[in-house]
């Protein structure tokens, strides 16, 4: 039989969990409420893309099967909290989901909120799977190899984009326009481009096309034109900043898994070196400014874990961060000279979220409905958006201040508990660094709403909380 012994059954569960993670990174890089907005290389121009409902139900079924198999392997009591995990922290996510359900009852858009609540529920399932199941399994790290393979696939796709893939995509769209297969006029009504113009740099490239083709390209939605002519990489993710978030979340643990104890040390070290080089290059090519800054913070935090004298660790960390900031200043000097438009746009989103939370402080407008609230507060000429680009403030807008406080208390509480632990296992240290990056990026992005980012983050968070404790200050360690 496939799994006759307890050890074999554990392996089946871990492999199934790894398959779930790999599939999430392969197929579910879009926000749950933006499933019809794809990168140009995969969009069917002229119409909305086919629904992902069946695939989504399939991946949820795999997650459900993993839960049944995983919890069946546990001895009673099955919901016994691991040592060192406060009860209030363990059950805060359940309270947060409960509040989302209350908000759902009065939502302004049932379809958006239903998709969001189902996604949030799947995140909680992943968290408790890590907390109660992975935390008790000796071979738990095996499941993370699926996430590592998914990261490698995204990086391979991004590398192809860098070396001709993006240009080929652009040329294919232009060929469709010239052949008549694509009529830009059918897309223009969807663009919502009032007050927006094509950037000067892109306009120069369009002007180099034949006059008739150039005129038709200008009729395309401006957002699509920007994507066509962008040099930023996104792999299989929704957009470049999401790829940066994926790299920051999973590259540290992937390297730790490869370099860790085991056979074939030299080949694994060589693969790790190549993965690090490609990962950092793709992070740079993604053009994510927040990603660069978070990477600097992670590098400084990693230096603090080195087994060297404290003064040397601090010196290395400070030097690395100063060099990184200097590089950032040089790289993006022109961006800030032009007014840092994306930063200004985000402040507009955040202002609208706070205004909505003030208007509906108890239950908000409903999970995942910021797009509707933003339309009421959007300044003339401001960029449209469907998400707040801040996971924390979106809770306030969508589910009121109680939803915000529950989510912020959970993420902040988990950070506080994990910061007090001294970790010796390189894989656990890498997981903590990746989760730190995910939590920080949540202040400027929407990783909570992207399954490929949220699922591995919640799973690893539960597993890390359940990991063996080694407290900095044992006098205050919980009983």
Feature-to-residue mapping (PLM):
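Alpha-helical transmembrane segments of multi-pass inner-membrane proteins
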Residues: 2-31, 55-73, 86-105, 110, ...
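A short secondary-structure junction motif
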Residues: 104-105, 360, 377, 381
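Short, charged juxtamembrane terminal tails flanking transmembrane helices
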Residues: 2-3, 473-479
């Amino acid at each position: 039989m496939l799994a006759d012994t307890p050890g074999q059954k554990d392996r089946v569960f871990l492999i199934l969990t790894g398959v779930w993670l790999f599939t999430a990174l392969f197929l579910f890089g879009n926000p749950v409420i933006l499933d019809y907005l794809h990168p140009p290389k995969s969009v069917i121009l002229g119409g909305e893309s086919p629904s992902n409902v069946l695939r989504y139900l399939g991946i949820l079924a795999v997650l459900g099967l993993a839960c049944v198999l995983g919890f069946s392997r546990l001895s009673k009591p099955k919901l016994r909290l691991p040592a060192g995990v406060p009860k209030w922290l363990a059950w805060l996510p359940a309270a947060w989901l409960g509040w989302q359900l209350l908000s759902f009852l009065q939502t302004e858009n049932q379809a958006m909120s239903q998709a969001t609540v189902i996604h949030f529920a799947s995140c909680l399932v992943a968290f408790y799977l890590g907390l109660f199941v992975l935390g008790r399994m000796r071979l738990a790290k095996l499941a993370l190899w699926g996430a590592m393979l998914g990261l490698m696939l995204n990086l391979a796709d991004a590398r192809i984009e860098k070396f001709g893939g993006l240009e080929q995509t652009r040329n294919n769209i232009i060929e469709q326009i010239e052949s008549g297969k694509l009529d830009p006029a059918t897309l223009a009504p969807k663009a919502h481009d009032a007050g927006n113009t094509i950037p000067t740099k892109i306009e120069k490239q369009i002007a180099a096309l034949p006059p008739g083709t150039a005129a038709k390209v200008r009729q395309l939605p401006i957002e699509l034109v920007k994507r066509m002519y962008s040099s930023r990489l996104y792999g299989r993710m929704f957009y470049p900043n999401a790829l940066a978030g994926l790299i920051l979340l999973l590259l540290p643990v992937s390297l730790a898994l490869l370099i860790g104890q085991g056979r074939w040390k030299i080949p694994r070290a060589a693969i790790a070196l190549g993965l690090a080089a490609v990962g950092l290059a793709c992070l740079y090519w993604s053009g994510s400014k927040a990603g660069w800054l978070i990477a600097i913070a992670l590098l400084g935090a990693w230096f603090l874990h080195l087994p060297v004298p404290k003064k040397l660790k601090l010196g290395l960390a400070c030097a690395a961060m100063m060099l990184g900031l200097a590089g950032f200043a040089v790289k993006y000097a022109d961006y800030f000279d032009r007014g840092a438009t994306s930063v200004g746009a985000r402040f507009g989103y955040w202002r609208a979220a706070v205004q909505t939370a003030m208007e509906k402080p108890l239950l908000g407008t409903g999970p995942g409905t910021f797009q509707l609230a933003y339309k009421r507060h959007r300044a003339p000429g401001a960029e449209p958006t469907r998400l707040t680009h801040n996971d924390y403030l979106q809770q306030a807008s969508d589910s009121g201040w109680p939803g915000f406080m529950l989510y912020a208390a959970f993420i902040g509480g988990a950070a506080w508990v994990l910061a007090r632990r001294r970790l010796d296992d390189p894989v656990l240290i890498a997981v903590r660094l990746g989760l730190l990056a995910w939590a920080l990026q949540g202040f400027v992005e929407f990783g909570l709403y992207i399954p490929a980012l949220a699922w591995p983050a919640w799973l690893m968070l539960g597993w890390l909380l359940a990991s063996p404790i080694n407290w900095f200050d044992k006098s205050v360690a919980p009983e």
